[in-house]
Amino acid sequence: MIQPQSYLNVADNSGARKLMCIRVLGGGRQTATIGDVIIAVVKDALPNMPLKKSDVVRAVIVRTSKGVRRENGMMLCFDDNAAVVINKEGNPRGTRVFGPIARELRDRNFTKIVSLAPEVV
C-alpha cells in the first residue's frame, strides 16, 4: 500500500530513479495498490535525461511490498515498491520497463506497460 510521503523505485528508463508519492488519484482514497495512478515528485534522477529532480509526474504502481490478493486466494508480494512514469493519456514516458510486472495492470487497461515488461507475474 502506497500513501502520501511513500518512496518508490522507478521501473522504467524515463530518467527518474526515485519518486515520492504526493497524492493518490481517484475517489479520495488514502492508499494506493497495484494498478492505481498517483501523483509523485522526482526525488532522484539521472543526469542529461528529460525528467529532472523536483518534477511533478503521474505514475502507475506496478509492484508493492504489501502485495495483492488474487481471486484464487494467492497472495502476490514483491521485494520493493515500484512505479512506471506515465503521461496524461496513460502511456509510459520511457521506452523500457524493468523487473516483473503484476498481471492486474492488464485488467486496468495499461496494456502498453504490460507489453514492454520482460516478465508478467
Curated annotation (Swiss-Prot):
InterPro entries linked to this entry: Ribosomal_uL14, Ribosomal_uL14_bac-type, Ribosomal_uL14_CS, Ribosomal_uL14_sf
GO biological process, one term: translation
Location(s) in or outside the cell: Plastid, Chloroplast
Entry keyword GTP-binding: no
UniProt keywords, alphabetically: Chloroplast, Plastid, Ribonucleoprotein, Ribosomal protein, RNA-binding, rRNA-binding
Disulfide topology: none
MF terms (GO), sorted A to Z: large ribosomal subunit rRNA binding; structural constituent of ribosome
GO CC aspect terms: chloroplast; cytosolic large ribosomal subunit
CDD domains linked: Ribosomal_uL14
Entry-linked SUPFAM superfamilies: Ribosomal protein L14 (SSF50193)
Gene3D superfamilies noted in UniProt: Ribosomal protein L14
The keyword Cytoplasm is annotated on this UniProt entry: no
Residues in coiled coil: none
One Pfam family in the UniProt entry: Ribosomal_L14
Subunit structure: Part of the 50S ribosomal subunit.
Biological role: Binds to 23S rRNA.
PANTHER family: 50S/60S RIBOSOMAL PROTEIN L14/L23 (PTHR11761), LARGE RIBOSOMAL SUBUNIT PROTEIN UL14M (PTHR11761:SF3)
NCBIfam families on file: rplN_bact (TIGR01067)
Family: Belongs to the universal ribosomal protein uL14 family.
Name of this chain's protein: Large ribosomal subunit protein uL14c
Encoding gene, per UniProt annotation: rpl14
